[in-house]
């Protein structure tokens, strides 16, 4: 090794040691609070799953198909949703699918609840967005497995850490697309609102957000798809659902189980994508 390389290696920046010290500090001083939060979140998620599983599967499938029709006004879509979910039930993966559905919906809802206000704020404050941008890039490019270690350390095993990891992974998408939607509103529309004496609050709620809604809804769809892509990773830290079946199939080399669970994830992804997409079934 050349002298310069030796020097650089000898004086390694202790990033790992700093990170370990930081998380050790958190666990030593806030472990009770963090575990209480995790247990509360686990209780809430488990309660949602148990509540949905109390319904007969066919009834719940019919209700989801009805919701698809209400959202998109498409009988064909409602029928496709009904048949797709019946296929999952036929594969004896209904309980796991409900667990995954709860995790995905909760993660997408939380990411939108956090990301949309941040995106609106960033759209009105360019300096804020310039500060956010490297953080968002880091959140999206950091390997998923790196998220699992600190979250597992802080929150333990269960659905709660799986949900937290998924939210962290998904938030950048909702922030970016909300920012894109608001900044893409034509200035002529905003100027027309100002000419009629609209306040900043009125401009936001009656001009900017309605114009940006298609892009924001695209952010919701992307958030759902990204949340689904995380189910296998979330299962590694105790989250249930279809990801657990995928990991079981991988560990035991069971092609049959992997194919069944994989197809169930695909069907669920298509169902959620079509139900939340603007413009399906003629809806505008």
Name each region found by the language model:
Residues 1-102, 109, 282-284:
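N-terminal, non-cleaved signal-anchor transmembrane helix
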Residues 103-106, 111-114, 123, 137-169:
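Generic hydrophobic transmembrane alpha-helix motif, especially the helices
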Residues 164, 168, 200-234, 256, ...:
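Transmembrane alpha-helices
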Residues 66-70, 88-95, 107-136:
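Transmembrane-helix boundary motif in ABC transporter permease subunits
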Residues 174-219, 246:
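Short cytoplasmic-facing helical segments at TM-TM junctions of multi-pass membrane proteins
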Residues 96-100, 120, 131-134, 177-184, ...:
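Membrane-spanning helices that line or support transport/gating and their immediate boundary helices
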Residues 42-53, 94-102, 106, 129, ...:
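Alpha-helical membrane-interface segments at transmembrane helix boundaries
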Residues 153, 182, 227-268, 280-284:
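Glycine-rich helix-loop "coupling/hinge" segments at transmembrane-helix boundaries
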């Amino acid at each position: 090794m050349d002298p310069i390389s030796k020097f650089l290696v000898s004086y390694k920046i202790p990033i790992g040691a700093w990170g370990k010290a930081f998380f050790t500090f958190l666990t030593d001083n806030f472990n009770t609070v963090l575990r209480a939060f995790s247990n509360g979140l686990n209780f809430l998620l488990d309660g949602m799953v148990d509540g949905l599983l109390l319904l007969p599967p066919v009834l719940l499938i019919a209700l989801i198909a009805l919701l698809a029709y209400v959202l998109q006004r498409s009988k064909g879509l409602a029928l496709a949703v009904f048949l797709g979910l019946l296929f999952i039930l036929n594969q004896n993966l209904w309980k796991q699918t409900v667990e995954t559905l709860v995790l995905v919906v909760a993660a997408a809802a939380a990411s939108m609840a956090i990301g949309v206000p941040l995106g609106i704020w960033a759209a009105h404050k360019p300096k804020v967005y310039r500060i956010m941008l490297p953080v968002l890039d880091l959140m999206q490019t950091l390997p998923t497995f790196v998220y699992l270690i600190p979250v597992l350390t802080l929150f333990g095993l269960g659905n709660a850490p799986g949900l937290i990891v998924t939210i962290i992974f998904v938030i950048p998408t909702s922030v970016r697309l909300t920012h894109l939607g608001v900044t893409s509103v034509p200035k002529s529309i905003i100027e027309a609102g100002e000419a009629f004496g609209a306040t900043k609050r009125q401009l936001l709620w009656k001009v900017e957000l309605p114009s940006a809604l298609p892009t924001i809804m695209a952010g919701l769809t992307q958030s759902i798809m990204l949340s689904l892509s995380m189910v296998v990773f979330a299962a590694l830290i105790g989250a249930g659902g279809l990801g657990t079946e995928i990991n079981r199939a991988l560990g035991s080399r069971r092609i049959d189980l992997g194919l069944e669970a994989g197809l169930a994830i695909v069907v669920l992804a298509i169902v959620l994508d079509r139900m939340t997409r603007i413009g399906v079934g003629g809806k505008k």
